[in-house]
Structures are given as structure tokens and as C-alpha cells.
Amino acid sequence: PSSISIYGENIAINNVGISQGNKYVRANGIVSSNESDSLTIELNELPVDYIQDVVNFHSVEFGGRASGRAYVTGINNSTPTLDAYIKVRNMIFEEGRMGNANLHAFWDSEVEGISSKGVMIDEGDIYTGVDGYVSPKNNRIDLLVSTHNTRAEFLNGIIGSIFDDIDGHVNGDL
């Protein structure tokens, strides 16, 4: 069974979640200002576009199904930390198929956003590296994208107003 217990300024969360079929988000841990207390959030097959809606971030569009874990500490203090290991099945970036993503993300107080590093592996020798950050609060994104035979479809979402039906493969850093 699930439970939420409140002790002064601390909140203990035990197996609290929402699910539908194989999709779920689940939380366990303690919410407090103590940095040794943490909250673990588990995701399974959660739609990435839904996550974008929740944080109200649409500077660029992502899609796919996210699964993994995020660890949050010091939620009630001025410098909380977030450390997440996420896999995204059938990742979409700006209308382009990117394959399956393995990402490490963490809260970066310097940019007031989430810094991430990872790789998206498509079929054959197609893969794309990513390193940078997104800041929903400041509506900013700064990503170094390293392409290796990456499908060029994602450029439709970026420069599609200038060029139509971009297809092919891309190599190099963007």
C-alpha cells in the first residue's frame, strides 16, 4: 500500500504513484531540507511530450517514452539536487526519429536548468551524442549535438520554414 506521512517539515512518501497499463510514475523517500534525505522517482514508458507539458517547456519538441530513475535531495532547501538516469524509447527531436536514448541528467543551479549528456542510438551505424542544458524557467536551450549518420529529419523542425521535406543523413557537430 501507498502512504504519505508528515512529520513537522518532513514528508515521508512510500510507493505513491499513478499508473495506466505499463505507464507509471512512482515516488519513494523523504522530502526534507536534510541533504542525506532523498526522494526517488521512477518512470516507466511515460510520454516525453507529457513531461514537456508539465514543466511548460516547448522551445524545442521532444517525443518518445521515458523510463528510468531520478534522485532528488534537499528539496526543502535553497540548493536541491537532481540526478537522473533515463532511457527514452523511440526518441523524437524536432520531428526527427533519433532512435533510443540513454541520458544522464542533473540539476544545474548555474543555468537554472537541467544539464544532460547522452547518446541516441538508431539502427545500424546511426547515433547522435548530446551534451548541454535546457532551462524551462528561462526558456533557454544550449545543446551540443554530435551527429554520426543521423537522420536529417530533425532539421525539418528547425529550418522547415525555409526548406521543405529535409531528408538524408547528417555528420558533425551542431
Regions found by a protein language model. Name each.
Residues 1-173:
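Interface amphipathic segments
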